[in-house]
Amino acid sequence: NESKSYDKCILKNISLEIDKGIYRVEGENGSGKSTLLQLLAGLETFDSGLKNCVSKDVLYLDTNQLGVVPFTIEENLQLLCDSFQIHLSFEDKEQINTFFDNKIGDNYMTASTGTKFKLGLSLIFAKNWDYIFIDETLSTVDARSIDMIAKRLISMKESSTIIYVSHNLLNQELI
């Protein structure tokens, strides 16, 4: 059983075994949803108990934007792929270009907020991840993009563990 606290106890005596599939985490603000995802992804450590974090291919996405300002969306995507040692196939590139409404050559600095968040989300299409943790990022993009992401995640649910936090009602279809 693990525990995690800050000024107050966020998670106490939790024990989880999570199978492959898609899971939605719900709760009030400050209830520990983000902390739980960070612990599971290995980005935070438990205060007490055994640490049973994942050690395979993990994608963790939150509301932080991942881009570098002077580059295009495509150049930023290449930087991310290089950091994860991902080689994109022609089909992957085409799917990602469609995800960006064929605007992958646009400058990251002038892109909309939703497009900037799509940069991290596009990694969902780049690889078959063992674990995907999505913390609120889905609420920042348009309905068409959510539909594309939902279809991709549903296609991965037999081989991946996908856990997401979202207040966007469009995402209820994932479960």
Residue ranges of model-derived segments:
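Conserved beta-strand
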Residues: 1-2, 7-21, 39, 49
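Short, conserved post-Walker A segment of ABC-type ATPase nucleotide-binding domains
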Residues: 23, 34-43
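The feature captures the beta-strand-to-loop junction immediately N-terminal to the Walker
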Residues: 26-28
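ABC ATPase nucleotide-binding domain signature region
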Residues: 41-82
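Conserved ABC nucleotide-binding domain
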Residues: 94-112, 128
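Hydrophobic anchor residue at the start of the ABC signature
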Residues: 119-121
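Walker B catalytic motif
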Residues: 136-137, 142
